[in-house]
């Protein structure tokens, strides 16, 4: 059983975090020329869309977004199930020489980010790839770090970070949850 342990971000803090990350992306990339955002399914997709919208509000110009399904790139595919559920990758633009920002909700072991890097490289050769996450919870198993982090939240391995999004969960909120024995 999982129970809520603490709230990390309420709706207001969540929105402020997305605004800050949007400004950081613009600043680090010296504007939005050749900039694209690609959300990692599932929760990275609405986050990428929201960041793109905020960047458009700031810069007055829209940027392209896509979505990435990393299922076949996972290194734990054989342990997931015999028939993994595949979703479509939708990147309706060339990534050649683009500044790609991968977007996900939580950075943990680094394995999802590694799979996403492999998936992007299969689409072409971008100028570079950056990573934006709402929460970095530590416990890396691979040498991967995010370029943009909403909040660093050190956790124990038995704790979970739950990023709730209005598009999926009906609310914007980040929680620490803990697995408890019944």
Curated annotation (Swiss-Prot):
Please name the Pfam families in this protein's record. Pribosyltran (PF00156)
**Per the Swiss-Prot or TrEMBL record, what residue ranges does the short sequence motif PRPP-binding cover?**
100-112
- What top-level class of enzyme does the UniProt entry assign? transferase
Write out the GO MF terms: RNA binding; uracil phosphoribosyltransferase activity
Record's InterPro entries? Answer: PRibTrfase_dom, PRTase-like, PyrR, PyrR_bifunctional
Supply the alphabetized keyword list. Glycosyltransferase, RNA-binding, Transcription, Transcription regulation, Transcription termination, Transferase
Reaction(s) the record says it catalyses? UMP + diphosphate = 5-phospho-alpha-D-ribose 1-diphosphate + uracil
Protein's UniProt keywords contain Glycoprotein = no
The source's domain of life comes to: Bacteria
Q: Which GO terms describe its biological process?
A: DNA-templated transcription termination
The protein's Enzyme Commission number: 2.4.2.9
Q: Which residues form a coiled coil?
A: none
Q: Spell out the family assignment given in the record's similarity comment.
A: Belongs to the purine/pyrimidine phosphoribosyltransferase family. PyrR subfamily.
Q: How does it assemble?
A: Homodimer and homohexamer; in equilibrium.
What function is annotated for this protein? Regulates transcriptional attenuation of the pyrimidine nucleotide (pyr) operon by binding in a uridine-dependent manner to specific sites on pyr mRNA. This disrupts an antiterminator hairpin in the RNA and favors formation of a downstream transcription terminator, leading to a reduced expression of downstream genes. Also displays a weak uracil phosphoribosyltransferase activity which is not physiologically significant.
Protein name per Swiss-Prot or TrEMBL: Bifunctional protein PyrR
Q: Which organism does this sequence originate in?
A: Natranaerobius thermophilus (strain ATCC BAA-1301 / DSM 18059 / JW/NM-WN-LF)
